[in-house]
Amino acid sequence: MNATRKQRLCLVIGVLAAAALAVTLIVFALQRNMSYLFTPSQVRAGAAAGYQQFRLGGMVKAGSIQRAADSLKVSFTVIDKNAATPVEYTGILPDLFRDNQSVIANGRMQGGRFVANEVLAKHDETYMPKELKDAMAEGHLGKPIPATAAPLTTPR
């Protein structure tokens, strides 16, 4: 192998190594910032057990909103077709947050309750992630969900 070919081979190997390193760093960065969406049924089935932080999506159960008198702490229940998950949140809720409203909460499970650090309320009928829309379509078919639609259960 002559010197020119050897130099070209070293250059190609160096470029490939740099590209592999860049792809590896991008994948690790994306994994850290990725937040998976689960419904209460999936949480109860244990699908979210391996995730420290995830998003919980569903409908706010009618009559479940309880506000603390002395703080910004709010408790409510997120339901889907088959399950309910109690949620605690401390902070200012969106103006559109109310009973029978689609909601997505970002947080973690703690002692059988979902502790949210962010709550998003449905902006209008077009705002809903496809995964949540598909999961909720089976349960309520666009109709309001009564307060007794899903029993309050704690995840395993």
From Swiss-Prot:
Compartments where located: Cell inner membrane
Alphabetical GO biological process terms: cytochrome complex assembly
Bilayer topology annotation: Single-pass type II membrane protein
One cellular-component annotation, GO: plasma membrane
Residues annotated as binding heme: H123, Y127
Gene3D superfamilies referenced in this protein's UniProt entry, alphabetically: Nucleic acid-binding proteins
Keywords, ordered alphabetically: Cell inner membrane, Cell membrane, Cytochrome c-type biogenesis, Heme, Iron, Membrane, Metal-binding, Signal-anchor, Transmembrane, Transmembrane helix
UniProt GO molecular function: heme binding; metal ion binding
Similarity field: Belongs to the CcmE/CycJ family.
Protein name (database record): Cytochrome c-type biogenesis protein CcmE 1
Organism: Xanthomonas oryzae pv. oryzae (strain KACC10331 / KXO85)
Gene: ccmE1
